[in-house]
């Protein structure tokens, strides 16, 4: 390679800094901003790009979905749907969740039913189960967002992958197996959250990440979209009227939603070497699709793109608060300020040795960092302990980021690339004190990392002198008001404005089941054998998200079918992915209000930016906020990846990490706090070992809770093992 060619390659790569991101840099070990490496390394990166397998530095920053792309993708989906005789609704989003098009085919069902028992299994009552007035447009958007948010340049996951990893057993259909690695992730990106953004409408995109109307979807029929190996968005289709999941993956399904949505990916395919079906966890291979494109009945390349008006196949459909039907929208380029994800300001995050870290942040519409490091807003220990300082938050983020850039990823390809994650730090009020992310972490991890951090802090508040104890906070929240199925939902959908509320009033809210949030407090205290657990007067206990997740499984220990449920979970026969327990019950009423807001075109006000505390569909107190828990504003999360932060024996905050394997997330949070404490001369620390949840002796000789679990040999640049032992 000539010197001029070397310079050209280096210049090209430097332009990629703000682009899609992910994977390794040359040897895969650098924690620094990319610099000009050897010509051999740089040539290798470009060759990888030409193979369609990006490693994070192989596309220009302008890579995005154009209007023509979106029109073609939707046209391909419609052609396959027509060929199979299943009219439906299709949605396309960009990588940060801007809705670019929603198309409703002629004859498509307008509403869908949420159910986990469409396979003929015994139906579950309560939660979201049986709710049958969900607009199909919202289901299609949720599917598209899921395909986009779970995928990166290192992995391509679909809604079928999501179905596999959120159920009570991994794999679904097996018995006496632990739950899915992302158990509970379906209740993230919630429309009532405070981190996710809200669309402005009018055919304009705005900074993300955006909220999803139904959280993340486990219903097959949602896929990521790629251009030149770079993820640029997602596509979702629903036509069968069921918003469900696959409860048994021992066979391959003939799910028409899935094959029809798959048609939209032709020409925008995920690289085969990045798809879920080449990625494993605990020795099991993920699923991407139960079809392949050879099963398509149509030639997608020759499919007619949709037109904005006078399309005989159907029409663009307005979705209040998400999409205006007057135009097809161009997507944003991920990693640029317009997307809401941008390189961290120069000098913001540095390693312990002073080298600048390759980090990204969330930015607002002006390009300013939304969550720069700041001091805590709380008064830890009844005001006797200093809150986290801004410089301490910065060091925590730096140490966590350094660890991520050293660690071997679990769910990325090629093998040997770095973990890619989002990192949130909060105080005891749940206020965000700082946020950072690696170059190509999956988009879902931003909101989830914040959920995780807040969850660890909240459940570690026993005996910490916090103004309102966890128990008192939960007791003050209104009960979820579960909806019953309505009679003739399609007739209701023909005139939502006049028929929806009367139809709901006939049977809703359900009188059984009708849990109270306070029930979970009582159940937790009994299960733990600690009458004052979660109380202001109780003895301090520290709960990582792995610990709280143990308590939130339908079996304890996790996966043992003959055992009872954890205290924060529904019992057998009442539990499903759509009715999990405390996690959903905290946010249920806000979800329903948001659906009503969209369905009735704004006649019902939209939810605020705090999910818990909504009175729900209560005719006497309709959708009011009561005793809201702002410290859990975007809901709780129940899979691992967070720890509380202490100053001595006093709780001062928490850190949450999400985006890679859950053991990696655990280690980055736990070891990140430890390393930050060392760097800050022990000014902060992990929870004292004696008060960690794994020290609680449970009644009836039940196995102990878990606190964190770190990978055995985690580093790319060292064979050091058991790095969390003894800390």
Residue ranges and their predicted role:
Residues 1-11:
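Bacterial N-terminal signal peptides that target proteins for export
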Residues 21-25:
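Bacterial signal peptide processing site
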Residues 16-19:
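C-terminal motif of bacterial Sec signal peptides marking the signal peptidase cleavage site
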